[in-house]
């Protein structure tokens, strides 16, 4: 059994490439996407349809309902299940998606022992400043408005009595797949902008507004996934704050910002990745599986 990861910015063609390669290499797929895990979020997540998936076994798609918890721990458990299935059935494993934080946890590991995040008993800014005063080396790697990571660092401090640096020193990370080969899809900026624009138009045409109305009615706006790109802008449209043209433009702009963040993260975190355009990457991956 061989395994690898395919990454790239949103709308880069990761899903199509993974499906094509999986069909050629006797592989199953683990989705590396924090939105595809949710049932009933089909259009906003741009998840592959059942027809597109065909006979290829997928993990990480339609795993939980929007009001249910899913985080990096659940993802790592999914990885274990997917790998066990692949080994048992003599399949290869392709991990594909744009949630780089999950992939980083897979190749670098996370520390065990913490409960769920401790709720902040002060403002996000105050919590950041407190932690910065206690552990400058660790906190200067985190943006002050990064709510998830600030809350995680604060939880470490409140639950363990240790600064994050002290905690990780005493609780070293354990990686599940430290030597995972990572392949990254590259696009020229103008081409990626065009792909994002076309996908956004298709999402709206396919029923994004109706999907969002359904999700809000069934789950309210409380779940974290209701703040995802595509959904949050559609809620603004439904509130009468923006018109339909602005809805499209805003989704495109926010998706472009996401793509920029993903690109920066991938460059900074996965230094041993192989990056190329799709045709060349396809050949390199097929070659890897054939060795």
Stretch-by-stretch model annotation:
Residues 1-291:
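Phosphate/pyrophosphate-binding catalytic cores of soluble transferases and nucleic-acid-acting enzymes
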């Amino acid at each position: 059994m061989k395994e690898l990861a395919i990454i790239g910015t949103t709308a880069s063609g990761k899903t199509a490439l993974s499906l094509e390669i999986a069909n050629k290499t006797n592989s199953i797929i683990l989705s590396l996407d924090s939105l595809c895990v949710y049932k009933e979020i089909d259009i906003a997540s741009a998840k592959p349809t059942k027809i597109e998936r065909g006979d290829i076994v997928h993990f990480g798609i339609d795993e939980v309902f929007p009001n249910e918890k899913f985080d990096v721990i659940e993802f790592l458990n999914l990885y274990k299940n997917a790998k066990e299935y692949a080994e048992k059935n003599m399949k290869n494993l392709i991990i594909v998606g744009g949630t780089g934080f999950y992939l980083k946890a897979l190749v670098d590991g996370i520390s065990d022992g913490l409960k769920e995040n401790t709720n902040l008993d002060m403002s996000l800014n105050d919590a950041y400043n407190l932690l910065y005063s206690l552990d400058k080396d660790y906190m200067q790697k985190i943006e002050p408005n990064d709510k998830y990571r600030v809350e995680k660092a604060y939880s470490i401090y409140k639950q363990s009595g240790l600064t994050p640096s002290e905690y990780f020193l005493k609780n070293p990370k354990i990686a599940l797949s430290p030597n995972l080969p990572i392949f990254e899809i590259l696009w020229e900026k103008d081409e990626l902008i065009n792909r994002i624009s076309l996908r956004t138009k298709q999402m709206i045409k396919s029923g994004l507004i109706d999907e969002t109305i359904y999700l809000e009615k069934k789950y309210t706006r409380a779940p974290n996934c209701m703040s995802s790109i595509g959904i949050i802008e559609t809620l603004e449209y439904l509130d009468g704050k923006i018109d339909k043209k602005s809805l499209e433009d805003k989704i495109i702009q926010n998706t472009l910002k996401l793509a920029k963040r993903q690109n920066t993260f991938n460059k900074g975190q996965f230094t041993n990745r192989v990056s190329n355009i799709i045709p060349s990457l396809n050949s390199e991956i097929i070659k890897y599986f054939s060795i």
